[in-house]
Amino acid sequence: MPDYTAMRQNMVDGQVLPNQVKHKALIGALADTPREAFVEGDKKGYVYSDRHIELGAERFLIGARVFAGLVEGLSPSAEDVALDVGCGTGYGTAILSKLCAMAVGIEEDSELVGKASALLTELEIDNAVAVQGPLGGGYSREAPYNVILVEGALPQVPQKIVEQLANGGRMAVVVNRGRGLYEATLITRVRDSFGSRVLFNSEVPSLPGFSAAPVFTF
């Protein structure tokens, strides 16, 4: 039987730490959370490799190196409320739940929502929930959010989601600029002013369902 604990630590040592991730709580959450539980079948055998793994319904488990870079960029803290957009089977939601006071994962696909909910229960995570809804609208019921993570590349930044940031809030999203350029972008809000900066460049699979969403302009 595979030693997932050792594989998990190797992922942290070989993919996360060399990428200059220094957020101690994040490093601990990555080392403790059973990533293999969020995929099925033979995918468990390479879930700790540095690749994006298909979950079904055009959703992917983002590779640990990129995922950790996005979450570190958010600077999550224990008082924060987090939104995980395109949560898939709930891995990102589970990680955010260990870094924040509360985490909400939103997903359009009912089967994935069911899997995410079951896994959060199985892992005894009581400060997180997976809900079903259109991704482009975020989840206004629990807004505003201190941190928002988008688990997939978007062609542009969706206005409805950005507007759900709290004062001082941060949003991490990979923007597909075209011609192979993918920018991991941090968006910040201070009162009614918004800013953005590029964290790093890395390709991730696209998150469908945003083509008709109103676009946020800075």
Identify the meaning behind each predicted range.
Residues M1-L83, Y91-I95, L99, L112-E122, ...:
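Class I SAM-dependent transferase core
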